A protein has these predicted regions:
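Terminal alpha-helical segments
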Residues: 1-160
Length: 160
């Protein structure tokens, strides 16, 4: 670990296949910190976590993927190689609706804190389901290990 006054820098290594899962975990962590005061930010960042999770899934299988932000388009790509549950499909569609309504004007949406909590739960569920695939789980485990190490180090640095 490398510290500079006012900032935390850690030298960590993470594989390319775990990288997007690591970023998705960071998004979920930020959403968990902000849902009560900034539910629109928390809900939107959960769409980012779902996007990174699905792209990470496809990356782990050495598949090319759409570089856009439409979750339902990514879902189609994931479904071409994996049987996604109906529940998870509805969660992805739910989050995709947040993404559109928060990105563009004149779309009806003003997420409540409860909506943000639901978005967090659904983003976590998507990662859990896709991470249950034995070809994917080692990379999610790696991402969780690095994420937790950084959170612990940050807490030690700034909470003591």
């Amino acid at each position: 670990m490398h510290f500079r006054e006012g900032a935390l820098y850690m030298s960590v290594h993470i594989s390319k296949k775990a990288e997007l899962f690591y970023k998705a975990l960071g998004d979920i962590w930020v959403a968990e910190q902000t849902w009560h005061g900034n539910p629109n930010i928390a809900a939107w960042i959960c769409t980012q976590a779902a996007e990174k999770t699905m792209k990470g899934f496809l990356r782990c299988l050495n598949m090319d993927y759409d570089h856009g932000h439409k979750l339902t388009a990514l879902l189609e790509e994931v479904e071409s190689v994996y049987n996604v549950t109906a529940e998870t499909k509805t969660y992805i569609i739910y989050l995709d609706d947040f993404d559109l309504s928060l990105r563009y004007k004149n779309m009806p949406n003003d997420p409540t804190p409860e909506d943000a909590k639901t978005a967090i739960s659904r983003a976590k569920h998507i990662m859990e389901e896709l991470g249950a695939n034995p070809k994917i789980s080692p990379y999610i485990d790696e991402a969780k290990e690095v994420h937790n190490k950084i959170i612990r180090a940050s807490n030690e640095k700034y909470m003591n």
